């Protein structure tokens, strides 16, 4: 599974009411997909576990869109 597909799957699984078809690269995690602060923490933790990486808090705050998360993970893995 590609990084993009895996990130999209994690987001769709963790955010209730979000279909994987809605998880497009340009989508804002908060504004478009409805993630609140707790959901964002859960997303980061799930991505860290799935990709066996550590995501710094400063870097996590910069993940505004789905694509931000995908690109960050591509660089780290």
Curated annotation (Swiss-Prot):
The yes or no answer to whether the keyword Lipid metabolism is present is yes
Pathway assigned to this chain's UniProt record: Lipid metabolism; fatty acid biosynthesis
Q: Which PROSITE patterns match?
A: CARRIER (PS50075), PHOSPHOPANTETHEINE (PS00012)
| Carrier domain mapped to chain residues | 1-77
Swiss-Prot/TrEMBL GO biological process terms: lipid A biosynthetic process
O-(pantetheine 4'-phosphoryl)serine occurs at which residues? Answer: 37
- List locations, semicolon-separated: Cytoplasm
Disulfide bridge partners, by residue number: none
Lipid metabolism found in the keyword field: yes
Keywords for this protein? Cytoplasm, Fatty acid biosynthesis, Fatty acid metabolism, Lipid biosynthesis, Lipid metabolism, Phosphopantetheine, Phosphoprotein
Post-translational modification comment from the UniProt entry = 4'-phosphopantetheine is transferred from CoA to a specific serine of apo-ACP by AcpS. This modification is essential for activity because fatty acids are bound in thioester linkage to the sulfhydryl of the prosthetic group.
What GO molecular function annotations does the UniProt record carry, in alphabetical order? acyl binding; acyl carrier activity
- Protein family: Belongs to the acyl carrier protein (ACP) family.
Q: Which PANTHER family match?
A: ACYL CARRIER PROTEIN (PTHR20863), CARRIER DOMAIN-CONTAINING PROTEIN (PTHR20863:SF76)
Q: Function of this protein?
A: Carrier of the growing fatty acid chain in fatty acid biosynthesis.
State the protein's name: Acyl carrier protein
């Amino acid at each position: 599974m590609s990084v993009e597909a895996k990130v999209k799957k994690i987001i769709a699984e963790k955010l209730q009411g979000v279909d994987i078809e809605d998880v497009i690269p340009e989508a804002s995690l908060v504004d478009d997909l409805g993630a609140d602060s707790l959901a964002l923490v859960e997303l980061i933790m799930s991505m860290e576990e799935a990709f066996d990486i550590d995501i710094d808090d400063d870097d996590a705050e910069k993940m505004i869109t789905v694509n931000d998360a995908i690109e960050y993970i591509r660089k780290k893995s």
